[in-house]
């Protein structure tokens, strides 16, 4: 049926004869549909040009929101934190791939080098304060979201996906180091790397000599000269042998550790500050000793341990007898056993970081202070003696470029997808790299369009879809790019300070301003969160900064690199199994074979290979589809491609809920058009039916749905047609036109005609193509007009574009130069003798897409591997389309 049959019948301004003429033969109706007057009359009848300046716009309809309406996010207190597998691509990835799949092609090597490792060096990076690390997306659940986001980051760190910043030049992580990380290695499994031992020895000797000075100074004043000579010998370039220097270093270390056991715990923090100052070469040791003693005589204590005299005296007596932990009054907040062990002391930087974190520990400060009221956090902290460590150290420590104590993007949590609200997903806002004058121009890669999917996957095969678990986190990132991928948490103290009313005084390092965060809401929330996180609540309350070790999802570079990675894998699979079809889009991989048994054999082989390479497949999401594949929201089988039922139901629901004769703001039109566009290629009129909506969006005006236009859209979207696969055939029908006439040439006849009035050349060419399709039924036409070749009909008059899309549905075009077009003379009113037609063979459109690589034959020289006997006859291997 004609798409405008019912619509023209319902328009009263069109007479009966005019309607019959518009619905009549195409050679008479198509030029009339291109007329400007008819299009204006139909637009007026459909109320598409109603002025809406004096009417109040509607900003929400159904679940679609427009201008001035904010959609509140929903926070789920019972979100499940995802558990990430130990994702680690093998260090010998290229060698293993060659062992399994034979020598890699040039394209495969080029793509894999882009992602192993990934590099990202923008021209400019803006750093934000740590306070913006966790975004307040849920005002009613601020504290809950804060701890959930911090827990998510620590989960990623424990899985080896994030680096933990120790200082501005050091990073630590868990897992196996990659080959490029070995070059910057400082520590691995608690042992110093060879390249770092010498520098660590020098720093330890300098630090130990400073503590030795304190011992000699208090024994005898005359020993001051001896210690100064010893310190001079440490810094001078002595000409002694290596054995003597090693003996001196061991002796200093034994004296250092022996004296350390007798130093009170409260005096450790000043000694660490003295150690950092002693590392400078140009300082006088006598001044340093005097400064140390003066600070000690003043009764210097850290702010977290300022308590009553009885508690202080009791704790000091106990720390003189035990150098491992505070027994009763001091819980082991930061693993003080490891910090005070000989291995922990010699690590200079690491021990100082632990002590610095313990000094700024909010939990420790509340433990020692008196409660300020009923809802003071002291009651929660003092209920448990051992709250666990303040921070963690990873298995590996590496050097890094200068990493500031800032972040480059904020984070927040959302539902994993619209259909799964029980699990959470991390959203990282790295949008600064896509904005401003210094924005990064991301590499472009083509996404397969609908016709390409139909040409490649519309076959009668057995289908299987695979899902790569945490696909982005498979791609490692170079450590040099870490300063651009920084996320973190400001800590509970700073985060809660911003929420309190008296947060104008930000000097939170003083005891008197510590209790201003105590409130009934925070107290009750922490009690509830303790049931979820337990002792980990203390760890999550500390500030930290992390950098991505694997590829984050919030950067425009990530989709491109993931597409290169998966396309290289599918290229190798197709090359080794030419009787199968492998295709990938981002993290979704599909396999196709002619029989279920053969598909099972290929699947088991690929799973074992991917697991050995370190690629984790989500077994729960592996689906066997049979002959009907569900992929990218489409249903694909031998007949063609159709949208899935859930998308059709969504479109129908939204259209039925649209109010009539009420102006909708253009933001609602934008979102509605995005939903309708997904199903538009399967309707009779395609995208051209939405042209009135596009015009309202472009002019930033409201749009009014009339009952006629709404019912017409419902009828269009109620009848969907599949997008069929294109066939490779030889062109046998050609069309051409002039502003006043048209011509058609086939293998056996020449046809020509004239228009009643002059038309634009592009419009005339489109009408000629429509006439050729109607009269010959050919699915392949030759034309010399680039506008018709593009298939984009939205630039033509609205009525003509809708009807032309209906007539030319499923039609392909071949370009023929005007000089070689056999329909050129008939379009000018000349009918010469028939000549042989130019030989133009049409090839189905696959475009240049990065997700599909042409696979050359496998080299014969490759290692012996398991032979998979195919049930398909391989004498003439079947090549997928």
From Swiss-Prot:
UniProt region (Disordered), positions on chain: 263-351
Record-level Gene Ontology MF annotations: DNA binding; DNA-directed DNA polymerase activity; metal ion binding; RNA-directed DNA polymerase activity; RNA-DNA hybrid ribonuclease activity
Catalytic activity of the protein: DNA(n) + a 2'-deoxyribonucleoside 5'-triphosphate = DNA(n+1) + diphosphate; Endonucleolytic cleavage to 5'-phosphomonoester
Compositional bias ranges of the Polar residues kind: 270-279, 287-314
Gene3D superfamilies attached to this UniProt entry: 3.30.70.270
Location of region: Terminal protein domain (TP): 1-184
Ranges for region Polymerase/reverse transcriptase domain (RT): 385-726
Residues noted as binding Mg(2+) in the record, renumbered to the chain: 467, 587-588
Activity control summary: Activated by host HSP70 and HSP40 in vitro to be able to bind the epsilon loop of the pgRNA. Because deletion of the RNase H region renders the protein partly chaperone-independent, the chaperones may be needed indirectly to relieve occlusion of the RNA-binding site by this domain. Inhibited by several reverse-transcriptase inhibitors: Lamivudine, Adefovir and Entecavir.
Free-text comment on this protein's domains from its UniProt entry: Terminal protein domain (TP) is hepadnavirus-specific. Spacer domain is highly variable and separates the TP and RT domains. Polymerase/reverse-transcriptase domain (RT) and ribonuclease H domain (RH) are similar to retrovirus reverse transcriptase/RNase H. The polymerase/reverse transcriptase (RT) and ribonuclease H (RH) domains are structured in five subdomains: finger, palm, thumb, connection and RNase H. Within the palm subdomain, the 'primer grip' region is thought to be involved in the positioning of the primer terminus for accommodating the incoming nucleotide. The RH domain stabilizes the association of RT with primer-template.
Miscellaneous: Hepadnaviral virions contain probably just one P protein molecule per particle.
Protein name stated in the entry: Protein P
Organism (species): Ground squirrel hepatitis virus (strain 27) (GSHV)
